[in-house]
Amino acid sequence: MTLMYDAIVAGGSITGLLTAREIAKKGNSVLVLEEGFEVGSPEHCGGLVSKSALNDLGIEPSVKSFDSKIESAKVFSPNGNHFSIDSTSQQIIVVNRRELDKQAAMQAQENGAEIIV
């Protein structure tokens, strides 16, 4: 038996899943191939993002995926120089990447994408 898809996405990380979601939204058949034993595992990077970036991507962090909010930070260089960042206007948040990836997978599937792990 031969299966045909309009698109095959290699990798079930946030980028691959959002790509699959957008392709599927247009009515195309999409297959996502993830090498891990489940979407979101292992985590590949931290989850420090702006709320506006998530909004632009069509993601509203669920309670499970939202860890905390960053209002300010001090950044230190190896030579001791440092500067402060006020991020209250940017709404910088820390998300649980595993849960955020699972949320993106659910969005992709709701739009018709298939995911194989």
Where are these regions (language model features)?
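Extreme N-terminal starter segment of soluble prokaryotic enzymes
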Residues: T2-A7
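Glycine-rich FAD pyrophosphate-binding loop
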Residues: I8-A10, R21-H44
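Glycine-rich NAD(P) Rossmann-fold beta1-alpha1 loop
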Residues: S13
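N-terminal Rossmann-fold NAD(P) dinucleotide-binding loop
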Residues: G16-L17
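Short glycine-/small-residue-rich flexible loop motifs, especially phosphate/cofactor-binding loops
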Residues: A20, K51, A105
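N-terminal FAD cofactor-binding segment of flavoenzymes
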Residues: E35-K74
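Conserved N-terminal helical subregion
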Residues: V75-V117
